[in-house]
Amino acid sequence: MVAEDAPVRGTCRVLFRTTTLLFLCTLLSLSISILYESLITQNQIMSQAGSTGSNSGLGSITDLLNNILSVANQIIYNSAVALPLQLDTLESTLLTAFKSLQTSDKLEQNCSWGAALINDNRYINGINQFYFSIAEGRNLTLGPLLNILSFIPTATTPEGCTRIPSFSLTKTHWCYTHNVILNGCQDHVSSNQFVSMGIIEPTSAGFPSFRTLKTLYLSDGVNRKSCSISTVPGGCMMYCFVSTQPERDDYFSAAPPEQRIIIMYYNDTIVERIINPPGVLDVWATLNPGTGSGVYYLGWVLFPIYGGVIKDTSLWNSQANKYFIPQMVAALCSQNQATQVQNAKSSYYSSWFGNRMIQSGILACPLQQDLTNECLVLPFSNDQVLMGAEGRLYMYGDSVYYYQRSNSWWPMTMLYKVTITFTNGQPSAISAQNVPTQQVPRPGTGDCSATNRCPGFCLTGVYADAWLLTNPSSTSTFGSEATFTGSYLNTATQRINPTMYIANNTQIISSQQFGSSGQEAAYGHTTCFRDTGSVMVYCIYIIELSSSLLGQFQIVPFIRQVTLS
């Protein structure tokens, strides 16, 4: 698939839905017109011929209206329910057919193996979904670790370091990237970037394995940092920024660092562009990828972002006096309401980072090769999210969700449902609805440890995203009972004791610590999927683990089955 063909499906859906809406509006107008004429006719008949004739005329008009409404209802059902389901089924059928038609590995001698970039049929329909009902979510447990071949390369010297993983999975394939530092773990001087793509296949033991089909090693002297990756049709898109100074210095800068988009296709086409999104220069002192993965949505690739906003700019002023306090805080914080509000308002501004406002948002880029000025920056409203931080975007069916790292004072897992508004075919605004939870805490320093429950200024924590196993919208009150899984560092203040868990809003349901007590670790990424053949749900937990042999950190993928007990 070439880059120009990528948005075709989304465009066709938009055209179909637009045409359907216009047709329905026409039917509605005709119905109103007929009803209006019928009322006039009824009055004329009653004044001239009495009630007997009017009843007959009115009955025929009522029958006509019923017929029109019946047709309209059928059109609404077909366009809103039946056709989307048929399109989804057709897509899955085509993917399955492509997979079965891929070149066989039993080829003539000296010919290459022509694997298609499509996951095994068992997984195509089991990706990016909610896998359990609310009731089932109360009875989930973690299975044992499964022994898979790692698709993530590691350092090969004691001085090397691999850090900041980003992983994205769709129906067709997966994409992965991490930073490679040759000496130490500081990435602001010199580093390289590893990128790979591949597919999920079953092993002879029945559980899944991740097969790498393409790799790219960016070692060209450009210090790309904090890269986020997203699967796109036919390949991967990666968003990075370029800097050779410490993070704090980025926030003190007058202009944001260089922003780059890299597109890598399965056919070995590689495109890299320096992008200049409008509204960034003179507004953002620094703009950073969220490191967690992005998503492909309606022809646009969306990436999580955060950074420092310059004082007295339009964005700064639009966020004045806005603050967000998670729902669970009211019952857990001993501060009075006025103190909570004041502390929450001030938590977005950091003297350590040059008195910038620390802001989260989304970078939206159309899937095309000329991206210099086409990407858009969409900030979240700060009365809906906490202080800006690293993050990740997810697709569950047709819904977009967002994870925000708990850098700020609230130490619990922060997940949001995102609504994206489109204007003239472009994303123009975003809003976020928090999934309320008082689990699972991250470690932090000082007054910002895992035990903190009250608003205040914090700049701490660690990236530890989570995967929703149940749909927060399935309850009458959004998110009142949601179950999710991930990995966290089970301590109040230190980055130690990596633990995989299943939790709901109020408690950890099941957990398994990896390694001995005191094992050092850092970032954690979690993605789940279903084997539709066996109906089993698997989760991959990608965790940065410290190593005493090779490098300060190694990135390790762990696979577990989530079982319904």
Swiss-Prot record:
GO cellular component, as recorded: host cell plasma membrane; membrane; viral envelope; virion membrane
Keyword set, alphabetical order: Disulfide bond, Glycoprotein, Hemagglutinin, Host cell membrane, Host membrane, Host-virus interaction, Hydrolase, Membrane, Signal-anchor, Transmembrane, Transmembrane helix, Viral attachment to host cell, Viral envelope protein, Virion, Virus entry into host cell
Topology relative to the membrane: Single-pass type II membrane protein
Catalysis: reaction(s): Hydrolysis of alpha-(2->3)-, alpha-(2->6)-, alpha-(2->8)- glycosidic linkages of terminal sialic acid residues in oligosaccharides, glycoproteins, glycolipids, colominic acid and synthetic substrates
GO molecular function terms attached to this record: exo-alpha-sialidase activity; host cell surface receptor binding
Chain intervals for the UniProt region annotation (Involved in neuraminidase activity): 223-228
InterPro entries attached to this UniProt entry: Hemagglutn-neuramid (IPR016285), Hemagglutn/HN (IPR000665), Sialidase_sf (IPR036278)
Virion surface side: 41-565
Enzyme category, top tier: hydrolase
A GO BP annotation: virion attachment to host cell
Domain of life: Viruses
Parts of the chain that traverse the membrane: 20-40
Record-linked Pfam families: HN (PF00423)
Disulfide bonds: 161-185, 175-236, 227-240, 333-454, 365-375, 448-458, 528-539
Family annotation (Gene3D superfamilies): 1.20.5.110, 2.120.10.10
Residues modified by glycosylation: 110, 139, 267, 504
UniProt note: domains: The C-terminus (head domain) is involved in binding the cellular receptor.
Function summary: Attaches the virus to sialic acid-containing cell receptors and thereby initiating infection. Binding of HN protein to the receptor induces a conformational change that allows the F protein to trigger virion/cell membranes fusion. Neuraminidase activity ensures the efficient spread of the virus by dissociating the mature virions from the neuraminic acid containing glycoproteins.
Binding partners and assembly: Homotetramer; composed of disulfide-linked homodimers. Interacts with F protein trimer.
Family: Belongs to the paramyxoviruses hemagglutinin-neuraminidase family.
Designated name of the protein: Hemagglutinin-neuraminidase
The species this protein was found in: Parainfluenza virus 5 (isolate Human/LN) (PIV5)
Gene: HN
